[in-house]
Amino acid sequence: MTHGPLVVLHDHLDGGVRPATVLDLCRAAGVATPADDADSLAAWMTIQPGMPLDEAFSRFDLVNAALQTPDSLRRVASEAVEDLAADGVVHAELRFAPLLHTAGGMAAAEVIDAVTRGLDEAAVTTGLEARLIVCLMRDQPEAVSDAAVDAAIAARGRVVAIDVAGIEPGFPAERHAGPIARARAAGLHVTIHAGEMDGPHQIASALACQPDRIGHGWRIIDDCEVSDGRVTALGPIASQLRDAALPLEVCLTSNACLGRPVHGHPVRMLADAGFRVGLNPDDRSITTTSPRREFELARDLLGVTEVEMAAMSERAAVDAFLPDDERAALVARVRAGWDVTVPRLVHLAERERWQAAQASGVYLPAEFEADGFIHLSGLHQVLTPANRFYCGRSNLVAVVVDALLIDNALVWEPGTGTDEYFPHLYGALGTDAVLAEIPFPPQADGSFLLPPELIRAVRRR
């Protein structure tokens, strides 16, 4: 598979340790292992479909038992960056729970410092500067989460966010609402595991905590009506999630290990319905995957094209927990690294209105809600819901727009649904943001297909 640079937003440090390293560290720490060679240990570490949750989590318990010294943490952090960089990753956010590594006497601050040193060492040789996300464990008391947040706040800069992770059933994210709010007030981002092991009610609980991203989230499909492989209606939680345009950090192989085969994964249906999705490895060693393999699976089993993969990579860069200038540089690097061009946004307007607006050099649409809007940087284009806009209308022009030039849309960037309107998006759209203008009449029955020239449009005015 040939592809451009990848961005990883959901990767657990303890889930990606090389089996040979686990064996070395366990021997050094005097921790018993279920196998005496790396290959056999790798087979044992791999989570199998249908495995009970407690048995699956025992794999992490073994790894974490060996990660109780500064040197062990430094080593696995460095190796994680090496492995990700070798797979074509140019930005990574590694998450872990520092308080799970204090059994040997280290304080949480020492744990974070050891991991940071490992990241710094690998950055010198790979050029990949990874960031850290501190996990709160959802089954632990609020006081423990407060301690984790304290450590995260103290390490702001390299630590960019907090997460709520661990076993979902019986442990809603709202149990940690106080620590989450305190982290946000201190300037940290928030991502929350939800809808991975349990249903949409866990996503509702996560949304109540006002996250910036959702880990996994695929079980939101249980709050959708589906017919003929398409989402036909959204329930209240699904509507809230889509309307919020929150990124879903989808992990195909990891979900398959918990019983959802990749070929039956709803990620494409969710993208078609306007949800903001991306692909991530989750636990590279324990689920035997990599960022590259996640894209290969999406291509081979879900029919994702290279243009769509490039779009997901760009959007992951937009969703990264970085300062604005670093995010802009990352987006530019990712876009330049793919051999395909992704039309970011398409605005459909009456041709006369658009031509009149060009005379002034900017497009300031009145009554914007009368116009149609399509976002093309998802996995797939959403066709059916927009028919209400096209049916019976003629003399339309499709204006292919570069989202990165629209009213600081690099930071804001809307969701993916065609059935959405964003009157606040166009503060002032300069003609230099336009990539192409294409006549776009609907078909006689009101349905439409995106013409190839629209998909390939790259001409800048």
Predicted regions and their residues:
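Metal-cofactor-binding active-site regions of metalloenzymes
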Residues: 1-188, 197-202, 207-213, 219-341
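Histidine-centered active-site/metal-ligand motif
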Residues: 10-12, 193, 216, 265, ...
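Short, surface-exposed loop/turn motifs that are enriched in glycine and acidic residues
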Residues: 192, 227, 256, 371-375
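Conserved, structured core segments of small domains
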Residues: 342-461
